[in-house]
């Protein structure tokens, strides 16, 4: 038995398989950060902190003794509870192919958003600064009209190149901006294709973020550290429902402030 206590859940292997498949599909669809940053791990449930390689002086224990404290980044645990009906679970054993897993999808989306918000917008309580606040390049304005996106992205690419940051460069767009580039054309040519001509990386739907980010994906500039990768655990059950939860442990570090341009 692990700390997830799944063995205690009144859920068959077939139902677990459906829940996990739906969870994985939904999480991967909504999460964006893992597609552009280096992912380290999962390193195990016991990962508590990431050493930063720096130290700071502290008050000595006695005269003539020099003391330093080594710095580290704490790993945080994210958890999102959700409830599924026992009827949906039992229907799988009866051969149903359409059990209602909407609570699974809603919770998977919620934890995907939480992870991406921590990466891109930061999480001060967890000592995570985030990509936006860590970036040293001037923030650019994301145009109101999608027809002006290619020019803005070209400016962002120029900023990265002038800062000595090589590509490939990937573009993350919030849901509205992503929809706009797919629905807008300029002289009959889709804006998405205009952007593909100036980018050598991916154009990624990132519904959790505000605005957009252009990032280098050359590697080595930012790291998402995972202790426990996204997992499903068991909390309790009654005659009608089973309470489960998504859980992961993570932290995020950015090493190269020049490797990103944010657009808002």
Curated annotation (Swiss-Prot):
<protein>
    <recommendedName>
        <fullName>Type 1 encapsulin shell protein</fullName>
    </recommendedName>
</protein>
<dbReference type="InterPro" id="IPR007544">
    <property type="entry name" value="ENCAP"/>
</dbReference>
<dbReference type="Pfam" id="PF04454">
    <property type="entry name" value="Linocin_M18"/>
</dbReference>
<keyword id="KW-1284">Encapsulin nanocompartment</keyword>
<comment type="function">
    <text>Shell component of a type 1 encapsulin nanocompartment. Assembles into proteinaceous shells 21-24 nm in diameter. Empty organelles can be expressed in E.coli. Cargo proteins (DypB) are targeted to the interior via their C-terminal extensions.</text>
</comment>
<comment type="subunit">
    <text>Forms hollow shells composed of 60 subunits. Monomers probably form pentamers which assemble into the shell. There are 12 pores where the pentamers meet as well as 3-fold axis channels and dimer channels; none are larger than 3-4 Angstroms in diameter. The N-terminus of the protein is inside the shell, the C-terminus is outside.</text>
</comment>
<dbReference type="GO" id="GO:0140737">
    <property type="term" value="C:encapsulin nanocompartment"/>
</dbReference>
<dbReference type="InterPro" id="IPR051429">
    <property type="entry name" value="Encapsulin_nc"/>
</dbReference>
<comment type="similarity">
    <text>Belongs to the encapsulin family. Family 1 subfamily.</text>
</comment>
């Amino acid at each position: 038995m692990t700390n997830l206590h799944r063995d205690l859940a009144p859920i068959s292997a077939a139902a677990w398989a459906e829940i996990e498949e739906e969870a994985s599909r939904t999480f991967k669809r909504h999460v964006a950060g893992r597609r552009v940053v280096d992912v380290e791990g999962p390193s195990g449930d016991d990962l508590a902190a990431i050493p930063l390689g720096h130290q700071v002086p502290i008050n000595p224990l006695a005269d003539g003794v020099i003391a330093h404290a080594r710095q580290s980044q704490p790993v945080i645990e994210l958890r999102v509870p959700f409830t599924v009906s026992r009827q949906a679970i039992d229907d799988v054993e009866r051969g149903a192919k359409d059990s209602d897993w909407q609570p699974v999808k809603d919770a998977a989306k919620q934890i995907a958003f939480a992870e991406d918000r921590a990466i891109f917008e930061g999480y001060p309580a967890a000592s995570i600064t985030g990509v936006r606040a860590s970036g040293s390049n001037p923030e650019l304005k994301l145009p109101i009209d999608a027809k002006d996106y290619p020019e803005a992205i070209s400016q962002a690419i120029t900023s990265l190149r002038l800062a000595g940051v090589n590509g490939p460069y990937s573009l993350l767009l919030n849901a509205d901006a992503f929809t706009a580039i797919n629905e807008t054309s300029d002289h009959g040519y889709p804006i998405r294709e205009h952007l593909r001509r100036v980018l050598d990386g991916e154009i990624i739907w990132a519904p959790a973020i505000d605005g957009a980010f252009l990032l280098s994906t050359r590697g080595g500039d930012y790291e998402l550290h995972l202790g426990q990768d996204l997992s499903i655990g068991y909390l309790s059950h009654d005659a009608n429902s089973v309470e489960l939860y998504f859980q992961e442990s993570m932290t995020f570090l950015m090493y190269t402030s020049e490797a990103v341009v944010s657009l808002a």
